[in-house]
Amino acid sequence: MSTQIAPARISDPAAFGRVAVLLGGTSSEREVSLNSGSNVLDALRARGVDAQPVDGIPALAQALVAQRFDRVFNVLHGHNGGGEDGIVQGLMEAFGVPYTGSNVLGSALSMDKIRTKQVWLSLGLSTPRYARLAAGASAQQIHAAAEQIGLPVIVKPANEGSSVGVSRVFDQAQLDEAVTLAARYDGALLMEQLIEGDELTVAVLGDVALPSIRIVPKGQWYDYNAKYIAEDTQYLCPGLDGDAEAQIGQLALDAFRAAGCSGWGRVDVMRDGSTGQLYLLEVNTAPGMTSHSLVPKAARQLGIDFEALVWRVLEQTL
């Protein structure tokens, strides 16, 4: 599968009009979103775009009522005051304002890791074995789910990102602590089979899968610290070779489209170290745009710098 990005369609920054960079918010990913938004804002302004920051959904609603903006670049991460659960997409559609990223359905579905898995499985796409745990699940239910899936497992909130509230569990004694951590966040919990092997991610831009990235953290796994703070995490791009790289790119596109996503995003995948089997984990519909973020790294592999990447994403609103 060739990875070719068409040339930019727009050359005049005035074509975008007044652009709101939606950032911050009140989700658990606020700090990451502020960082992403600041980078996007700087890149747009460097290209001559009339861009202004807007912190959170209430501020955006006020701006839309006042007709202050012509379009929105959404880097509001997460849910519950974030911009990846379909709520802010519905707001922007109600005002008829174009925005970056997936629509209401794609955003809402992808924010719910459990429902996304159900869609993938219905289409024959591989994802780790899992169980849904309701908030307040009993110890008996928790341990029964782990026994059914088979240890080791990962326990996480079903609707959070950035590895917030995530634990790896290798024995029954660790389960209660993992569930307690994940239960600090709203909604159901997801317990899923832990796939031992390579952690990979594939960015999607338009209808093209960018080169995959294989993530090699210094520690045992790619947690919040490895994602946003540590300087010793290795990123290998492309992450795979030959047919395997083509396979993961096509899988990412299939998974992205199956979830109703469009515009741009990122699909996270595990590759079993013993069998080479690929397993879909989740879709991110407003990926990070920090100095550690993965979409910019993949774009650079194709000669697309950060400013050009931000421009390409915004182009999709025209």
UniProtKB/Swiss-Prot annotation:
The keyword Lyase does not apply. The keyword NAD does not apply. Keywords: ATP-binding, Cell shape, Cell wall biogenesis/degradation, Cytoplasm, Ligase, Magnesium, Manganese, Metal-binding, Nucleotide-binding, Peptidoglycan synthesis. Transmembrane segments: none annotated. Residues 117-315 form the ATP-grasp domain. GO terms for biological process: cell wall organization; peptidoglycan biosynthetic process; regulation of cell shape. Mg(2+) 2 binds at E282, N284. Pfam families: Dala_Dala_lig_C (PF07478), Dala_Dala_lig_N (PF01820). Binds 2 magnesium or manganese ions per subunit. Disulfide bonds: none annotated. GO terms for molecular function: ATP binding; D-alanine-D-alanine ligase activity; metal ion binding. Pathway: Cell wall biogenesis; peptidoglycan biosynthesis. Its cofactor is Mg(2+); Mn(2+). Mg(2+) 1 binds at D268, E282. Cell wall formation. Belongs to the D-alanine--D-alanine ligase family. This is D-alanine--D-alanine ligase B. It comes from Xanthomonas campestris pv. campestris (strain ATCC 33913 / DSM 3586 / NCPPB 528 / LMG 568 / P 25). The gene is ddlB.
